[in-house]
Amino acid sequence: MPHISYPVIFNNVESFGQFLLGNTEILSYFFITFDFALSIGKTQINLLLPATFPYLRKGRPKTINFRIMPDFVHLHVHTQYSILDGAAAISPLIKRAKALGMKALAITDHGNMYGVKNFHDVATDAGIKPILGCETYVVRNRFEKDKDEKAGDHLILLAKNLTGYHNLCKIVSYSFTEGFYYKPRIDKKLLEQYHEGLICCSACLGGEVPQAIMRNDMEEAEQVVRWFKSVFGDDYYLELQLHPSGDPRKDADVYENQLLVNKALLELSAKCGVKYICSNDVHFILAEDAVAHDHLICLNTGRDLDAVSYTHL
């Protein structure tokens, strides 16, 4: 029997069951009804080891605590259709999500919905619920061509129903036909007009709320949160991210700021009555793809590899 560290944490009930099936010594002592545990929302199972259990070590507690984590869904995901930024091809991405036992997955490419049809079809065929979205760029006025605002603040929009999908298509279309300046851009008037059926998330460090927090302008951050809540109601979420890289240069630019922003977002959540989610800024599939992704960023920005500071997980 392999060495087991306690408590043992599993991503879902299925992986817990696979663990037990792979350790028949444990199964010979216990019988657990997983369906019942699920029906009552049970996420923690305690197993009491009898004194005769052959692998009970001296000094080890006799109760093994198994904690089953709730299902996690990636809601901030960039595919290869985030041009010169995303390095996750759709089919391998869905295959990886399936292997990890994920039941749903979002697509939120930068400023476009080019990959939505392919993503929807591949995910559906794999039995994964596709969540269709976009990471938009928000400026004060989409009609103004101001170089100081050509980038815009990042904002995640997710369609929660057919109405939301239609409104998302309209918003993204207008970002090209009316707001394009270096990038497809939208403004808050479009959000007010076409918010129905959409879930809105505050996005990464490039979002309007995190940017205000990093400027130490909590008053502005609160005003922005309250505006989005007034438009989207309970469908507005603050987005927490944490991406330690192990590289001191990158961590100083990203991870340390994320720690600062997350603390402030949690305070704003409590103060403004806004819910929050946890996400990863997914741009590639496997950890070993990070180097290739850094090269892609260099092609996009024209910077040297040593100057790349932002890495995605």
Language model segments and positions:
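Ser/Thr/Pro/Gly-rich low-complexity, intrinsically disordered segments
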Residues: 11, 16, 35, 53-54
